[in-house]
C-alpha cells in the first residue's frame, strides 16, 4: 500500500536493510523508514536544488503524508540517514512538508514557518512549486537561474 502510494507520486521505493550512502550531486537523497509491517523502506526521492548556506531542505509533501503515519519515532531513529549535513535532522510536521531543520529548531515547531521563509528567500533555486505549503515567498520553477537537477 505504501509502495503503491509512493509510486503514484513518482517516488522510487525499495525494501533494503543496508545503508545507502546518498549523493546530493544529482539532487537525489534517500530516506529510511518503517513500512506498515515493520519492514525497512528505502525511498529515493528528488529534492529541490539548494544552496550550501541554507539550513533547510524541503522534501515532497506527499512523502511527509506517508511517513507521518509512522510516528515521530521515524524521525528520531533515522535522523543521521536523512541528512546530507551532520548538523541537521529531519522533522515530520503534521500537515506540512517533510523538512530538515537544525536540531535547535526542532525544540520549537513554531519556527518551521521561519525556516521555510529562510529557504525561500536565501536561495531562489531552492523551492519547487507545491513543495512549500507554509507561509513565505515562493519562486516559480521556470524562474531564470533555476536549473532543475543541478545544485
UniProtKB/Swiss-Prot annotation:
Induction: Induced by DNA damage. Keywords: Cytoplasm. Its main location: cytoplasm. It comes from the Eukaryota. It is found in: Cytoplasm, Cytosol. This is Protein InSETG-4. It comes from Homo sapiens.
